């Protein structure tokens, strides 16, 4: 018996895996957002859901979901869980950066450092890992990438957000 023309025939052939190089996806997502966000001074952190498309080669399509003045509160907000319905999430923050000293620390607040620079950071997180891309306002054509080796409170919060989401919340009246 032949399937009706409006029903696709099913096969048992294995579909080749999609190329999900997290760093490549982060760079492409950052490029798209760089053209959409013309600022290195946002009023708050932004959260985007990122669809990668249906082809074997991903084409990131970011979708704005939410914004909050505090990136940690943004990641913990119940509505931010919507990002996990996408293939990936992108967190965008702006601020000040300053050079590290010989111990790997910044002397004082980056915003008060003599060599401070405006920066925009985009962190992409997906099941295949975490990667980040940043640009400086004084060199907007250059990007700095990190394939997931970042540490600190933001890296921990992003990992918790994607890989260890809250199971449920108790609502009391």
Predicted feature descriptions by range:
Residues 107-173:
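Glycine-rich, aromatic-bearing surface loops/beta-hairpins
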Residues 29-73:
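N-terminal interaction modules that seed assembly of large macromolecular complexes
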Residues 71-108:
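Short HxH-centered metal-ligating active-site micro-motif
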Residues 43-48, 86-88, 117-121:
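Short, surface-exposed beta-edge/turn micro-motifs
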């Amino acid at each position: 018996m032949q399937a009706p023309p409006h029903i696709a025939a099913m096969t048992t052939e294995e579909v080749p895996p999609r190329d999900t190089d997290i760093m490549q996806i982060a760079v492409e997502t950052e490029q798209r957002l760089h053209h959409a966000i013309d600022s290195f001074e946002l009023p708050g952190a932004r959260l985007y859901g990122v669809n990668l498309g249906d082809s074997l080669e991903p084409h990131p399509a970011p979708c704005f979901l939410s914004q909050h003045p505090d990136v940690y509160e943004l990641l913990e907000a119940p509505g931010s869980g919507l990002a996990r319905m996408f293939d990936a999430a992108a967190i965008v923050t702006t601020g000040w950066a300053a050079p590290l000293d010989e111990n790997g620390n910044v002397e004082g607040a980056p915003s008060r450092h003599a060599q401070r620079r405006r920066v925009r950071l985009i962190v992409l997180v997906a099941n295949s890992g975490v990667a980040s891309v940043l640009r400086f306002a004084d060199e907007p054509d250059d990007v700095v990438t990190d394939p997931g080796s970042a540490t600190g409170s933001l890296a921990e919060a992003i990992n918790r957000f994607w890989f260890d989401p809250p199971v449920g919340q108790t609502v009391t009246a």
